[in-house]
């Protein structure tokens, strides 16, 4: 059985609050495609694997991304330069960056973190989340 990595050897992550400004609404699966294509166009496949963008939460028009700390600037520049998706104009604005999801939700998205915390606690009681 594999041992887990100690915290000092794990990849450092940052959480990015973003907002999509567009005429149309996008479902969560399409937002994943938008973020991936923005990073792929600007950074390429190797850069996308290094940035490692992961969509944590999305409720139109804002969401939360998890990215690698070292490549945060690449993500910022690729999202700023992305201006068109499926021939529709689109603008992705970064609201803020933090090292915790709780801080992102409360400070930048103005959403209480407590409902999410209660769901996680219920799942832990059922032994579904470690």
From Swiss-Prot:
Domain of life of the native organism: Archaea
Entries under InterPro entries matching the protein: Pop5/Rpp14/Rnp2-like (IPR002759), Rnp2-like_sf (IPR038085), Rnp2_archaea (IPR016434)
GO MF term (any one): ribonuclease P activity
SUPFAM superfamilies (alphabetical): Rnp2-like (SSF160350)
Protein keywords: Cytoplasm, Endonuclease, Hydrolase, Nuclease, tRNA processing
Family according to the record: Belongs to the eukaryotic/archaeal RNase P protein component 2 family.
The protein's role, per its UniProt record: Part of ribonuclease P, a protein complex that generates mature tRNA molecules by cleaving their 5'-ends.
Descriptive protein name: Ribonuclease P protein component 2
Phylogenetic lineage: Archaea, Methanobacteriati, Methanobacteriota, Methanomada group, Methanococci
Gene expressing this chain: rnp2
